Amino acid sequence: MTLILGIDPGSRITGYGVVRDTGRGCEYVASGCIRTGDGPLAERLQIVFRGVSEVIRTHGPVTMGIEQVFMARNADSALKLGQARGAAIVAAVEAGLEISEYTATQVKQAVVGTGAADKQQVQMMVMHLLKLVQKPQIDASDALGIALCHAHHRQSLIPHGLASAKRRGGRLRL
C-alpha cells in the first residue's frame, strides 16, 4: 500500500489530498486547503512550503502528483502559480518524495473519463471513487483528483517494466 499526495497549487489557496493506493483501488486518507491570506508573495510562498511540509510529516506519503502550470491569460497570475508550485515541489523534494506532474486534462481524463470535465464533475467523481459522504472543498477535491490520477498512472506503468526497474539512491531509475 502506497500513500500518495496530490497537490493543486495556488498562491492564495493550495489544495492537498492524500490517498492510500491499495493495488485494488484507492482509499481516502485526508484532504484540505492551505490558505495563505493576502500578505506579501514571499510570505504566502513560505506558508505553502510549510503547509505542504506539515501534510507530508503528518501523513507520510512517499510520492506526490502535482498539477502542471497552465498558460493563463494573465502572466502575473501564471508566474505566481508557478512560484507556489515551486514551494510545494521543494517541500516534497526535501522530504524525499518522488514527484510526477499532470496536466488538468490528464487529471480529468483519469477521474471522470473525459478531459473536458468541469470542476463539479471532478468533485462528484472524487466523492464516488473515494466513497466520501461530504463534498470536499473544490481545491481539495482537485488535489484528491490529482492523487487518483497519479495512482492510475503508477498502476499503468507496472505491466510495462516498472516493477523490474532498479532502485538507485532511493529513486526509481528506468
From Swiss-Prot:
CDD domains xref list: RuvC
Record: residues binding Mg(2+) 2: 67
GO biological process, one term: DNA recombination
Compartmental location: Cytoplasm
Cofactor(s) needed for function: Mg(2+)
GO molecular function list: crossover junction DNA endonuclease activity; DNA binding; magnesium ion binding
EC numbers: 3.1.21.10
Top-level class of the enzyme under EC nomenclature: hydrolase
Entry annotated with the keyword Repressor: no
Active site: 8, 67, 139
Catalytic reaction list: Endonucleolytic cleavage at a junction such as a reciprocal single-stranded crossover between two homologous DNA duplexes (Holliday junction)
Binding of Mg(2+) 1, residues: 8, 139
Cited Gene3D superfamilies: Ribonuclease H-like superfamily/Ribonuclease H
Top-level taxon of the source organism: Bacteria
Note accompanying the cofactor annotation: Binds 2 Mg(2+) ion per subunit.
GO cellular component, one term: Holliday junction resolvase complex
Record keywords: Cytoplasm, DNA damage, DNA recombination, DNA repair, DNA-binding, Endonuclease, Hydrolase, Magnesium, Metal-binding, Nuclease
Claim: Hydrolase is one of the keywords in the record: yes
Family: Belongs to the RuvC family.
Described purpose of this protein according to its UniProt entry: The RuvA-RuvB-RuvC complex processes Holliday junction (HJ) DNA during genetic recombination and DNA repair. Endonuclease that resolves HJ intermediates. Cleaves cruciform DNA by making single-stranded nicks across the HJ at symmetrical positions within the homologous arms, yielding a 5'-phosphate and a 3'-hydroxyl group; requires a central core of homology in the junction. The consensus cleavage sequence is 5'-(A/T)TT(C/G)-3'. Cleavage occurs on the 3'-side of the TT dinucleotide at the point of strand exchange.
Subunit composition and interactions: Homodimer which binds Holliday junction (HJ) DNA. The HJ becomes 2-fold symmetrical on binding to RuvC with unstacked arms; it has a different conformation from HJ DNA in complex with RuvA. In the full resolvosome a probable DNA-RuvA(4)-RuvB(12)-RuvC(2) complex forms which resolves the HJ.
Protein name (database record): Crossover junction endodeoxyribonuclease RuvC
Gene designation per UniProt: ruvC
